[in-house]
Swiss-Prot record:
It comes from Chlorobium phaeobacteroides (strain DSM 266 / SMG 266 / 2430). ATP binds at H17, D172, A173, K174, R245, F246, D254, R260, K261, A277, K281. Belongs to the AdoMet synthase family. Mg(2+) binds at D19. One of its GO terms (molecular function) is magnesium ion binding. HAMAP family: S_AdoMet_synth1 (MF_00086). Its EC number is 2.5.1.6. GO terms for cellular component: cytoplasm. The gene is metK. Residues 1-13 have a biased composition (Polar residues). This is S-adenosylmethionine synthase. Homotetramer; dimer of dimers. Binds 2 divalent ions per subunit. Binds 1 potassium ion per subunit. PANTHER family: S-ADENOSYLMETHIONINE SYNTHETASE. The keyword Transit peptide does not apply.
Length: 404
């Protein structure tokens, strides 16, 4: 019997990537609005470029937020603190263009007087479809290529912030991992790409010599630490700063915008995406809250041993609390003789996917032990401190489906 063999690739970017700088500022602004007023309605977009930050969007809130202070704090935490970066927390301009939300939208989302059931009083903030996914490739029940890619850039940031080794590192970085699969199982890492911003070569050191130092350091201190040795072999291709010099980066090298890294934020291309970004959006926006809830459903189904893979789609109409549709696909991996229809029937009963129920279940308007800014770099999923990663519905699912 012939084996099925294929390659699959996912990428990630560091917290210093310009689009991620934007995401983190947007979510930090959201965090402060939510802290002051848990019922805030926020749609916050951020634009960053050479020496400039613009924060705009629509807000309905009782809170008052100092956008300048928040933006500079985030930029400082990321590490853009030197004038030579041409984007510096202390000297960049910060313009706030936040304004009030359309009352037409607000009327459809908050309907307190009209409806008796409080969980039906919050309608979806917009129409759209959202996806959740889980698989058995990693302990976090996430796709392996994405997890490795996220860990590579996260490790780079940790090394940079510790400041003990590789002191030439600057905040902007990207990673990409290609895995080889045989019969649906990860066999090996076929290729790794790491591009990191760095200081100019020291005086008397050629560009080629400097890149050789950087390549050696990244292989030893990043790739070999993150990627299991059993998955690396002599055929694995390692591309470190493949274009060579990477001194100019961050918002000076490329303009950043909120919501442009939606595949990095989710499943690395292993699952569909409804198209709606997360950062800067309060939890009444189902682009965010329903994507979190869909991951929760998929993860509990896989954690319960009902399937090895699970994709969940949910869709909404603006102003309507109940989902328009729910769809579950286990990609032929369902176990115990179960069908997708049987799993879906029970899941629809066990998981309440009305926006108000999602917000209440995960504490999305009163985060405890986490904040939205944390989600804005290194992925919204596969990180155990987020409440939508809990697997507390496993036993209920198994009981409902008569699975031991």
């Amino acid at each position: 019997m012939s084996q099925s063999r294929y390659f699959f690739t996912s990428e990630s970017v560091s917290e210093g990537h310009p689009d991620k700088v934007s995401d983190q500022i947007s979510d930090a602004v959201l965090d402060e609005f939510i802290r002051q007023d848990p019922d805030s309605r926020v749609a916050c977009e951020t634009f960053v470029t050479t020496g400039q930050v613009i924060v705009g969007g629509e807000v309905t809130t009782k809170g008052v937020v100092d956008v300048q202070t928040i933006a500079r704090k985030v930029i400082t935490e990321i590490g853009y603190t030197k004038g030579e970066y041409m984007f510096d927390a202390h000297s960049c301009g910060v313009l706030s263009a936040l304004h009030s939300q359309s009352p037409d939208i607000n009327r459809g989302v908050d309907r307190k007087e009209e409806i008796s059931d409080e969980l039906d009083r919050v309608g979806a903030g917009d129409q759209g479809m959202m996806f959740g996914y889980a698989c058995t490739e990693t302990p976090e029940l996430m796709p392996a290529a994405l997890q490795f890619a996220q860990q590579l850039v996260k490790k780079l940031a940790e090394i940079r912030k510790e400041g003990k080794i590789m002191t030439y590192l600057r905040p902007d970085a990207k990673s990409q991992v290609t895995l080889e699969y045989v019969d649906e199982q990860v066999k090996r890492v076929d290729a790794v790409v790491v591009s990191t911003q760095h200081d100019p070569e020291p005086e008397g050191v050629s560009e080629a010599e400097w890149q050789a130092v950087i390549k050696k350091d990244i292989i030893e201190n990043v790739i070999n630490v993150v990627i299991p040795a059993a998955l690396l072999d002599e055929k694995t291709k390692l591309h470190i700063n493949p274009t060579g010099r990477f001194v100019i980066g961050g918002p000076h090298g490329d303009t950043g915008l909120t919501g442009r890294k939606i595949i990095v934020d989710t499943y690395g291309g292993a699952a569909p995406h409804g198209g709606g970004a997360f950062s800067g959006k309060d939890p009444s926006k189902v682009d965010r809250s329903a994507a979190y809830a869909s991951r929760h459903v998929a993860k509990n189904i896989v954690a319960a041993g009902l399937a090895d893979k699970c994709t969940v789609q949910v869709s909404y109409a603006i102003g309507v609390a109940q989902p328009v549709s729910i769809y579950i696909n286990t990609h032929g991996t369902a176990k115990h003789g179960l069908t997708d229809a049987e799993i879906q029937e029970k899941a629809e009963v066990i998981f309440d996917l009305r926006p108000a129920s999602i917000i209440k279940r995960f504490g999305l308007n009163k985060p405890e032990g986490w904040c939205y800014q944390e989600t804005a770099a290194y992925g919204h999923f596969g990180r155990e401190n987020f409440p939508w990663e809990r697997t507390e519905k496993v036993e209920e699912l198994k009981k409902a489906l008569n699975v031991a």
